[in-house]
């Protein structure tokens, strides 16, 4: 399954997780599989998803509402990197990634939050104060959505974020990531090395 996207600065999808359309549910499934396969708890994964729903309605090519497509001075993407050039130029430009692919945006969260291209994104003003503790926390999805908003997004808090996180937690609870990494499913780890500015960057994808 690949990510769905609409390259737009208009609101075309809903911010209410419970009212998500099939394209959004597909993207939510991709996000759930991505973070769960990397060891994030169900609650932390849902918290990240709840914030993304509020920021972009789970559209990886969402430009900031009221802006225009291509405006790199305002927000862009699943978590509305602001300005957009932070994601587009610094990250995609460095590694040669497709800006519309939600996979690489999730990869940014997973690999760039601590010690990434911009240093540390997680500021730890509320518990869990460390990124590693957040990733495995089994606090409620709603409480972790608040922690992600304050420590990572650093944006305005809305109970919509909590409600979305709780919804996605209940929706996916107990469903293992696909493909699984428990040894029962045969998987092949595909690794591509990309040489950028003298460094090798390893990109991991799992396939059945």
Predicted regions and their residues:
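Mid-sequence acidic-hydrophobic segments that form the walls
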Residues: 112-116, 151-155, 171
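Extracellular cell-wall/glycan-interacting regions and their flexible linkers
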Residues: 1-49, 68, 155-208
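C-terminal binding/interaction regions
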Residues: 131-133, 145, 149
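Short, functionally critical alpha-helical segments immediately adjacent to catalytic or ligand/cofactor-binding
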Residues: 42-59, 109, 149
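Peptidoglycan-targeting cell-wall enzymes and recognition modules
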Residues: 3-30, 37, 56-140
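A charged, solvent-exposed segment within the mature domains of Sec-exported extracytoplasmic proteins
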Residues: 140-147, 154
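Charged, low-complexity, helix-prone segments enriched in Lys/Glu/Asp/Gln
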Residues: 51, 80, 84-92, 145, ...
């Amino acid at each position: 399954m690949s990510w769905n996207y609409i390259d737009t600065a208009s609101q075309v999808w809903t911010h209410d997780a419970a009212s998500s359309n099939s394209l959004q549910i597909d993207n939510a499934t991709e996000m759930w599989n991505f973070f769960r396969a990397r060891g994030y708890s169900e609650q932390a994964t849902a918290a990240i998803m709840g914030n993304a729903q509020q920021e972009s309605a789970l559209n990886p090519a969402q430009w900031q509402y009221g802006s225009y497509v291509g405006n790199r001075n305002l927000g862009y993407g699943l978590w509305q990197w602001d300005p957009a050039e932070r994601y587009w130029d610094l990250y995609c430009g460095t590694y040669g990634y497709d800006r519309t692919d939600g996979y690489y945006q999730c990869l940014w969260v997973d690999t760039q939050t601590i010690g990434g291209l911009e240093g540390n994104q997680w500021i730890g003003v509320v518990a869990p104060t460390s990124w590693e503790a957040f990733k495995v926390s089994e606090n409620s999805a709603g409480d972790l959505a608040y922690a992600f908003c304050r420590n990572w997004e650093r944006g305005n808090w809305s109970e919509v974020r909590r409600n979305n996180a709780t919804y996605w937690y209940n929706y996916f609870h107990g469903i293992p990531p696909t493909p699984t990494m428990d040894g029962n499913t045969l998987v092949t780890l595909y690794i591509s090395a990309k040489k950028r500015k003298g460094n090798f960057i390893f990109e991991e994808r799992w396939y059945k």
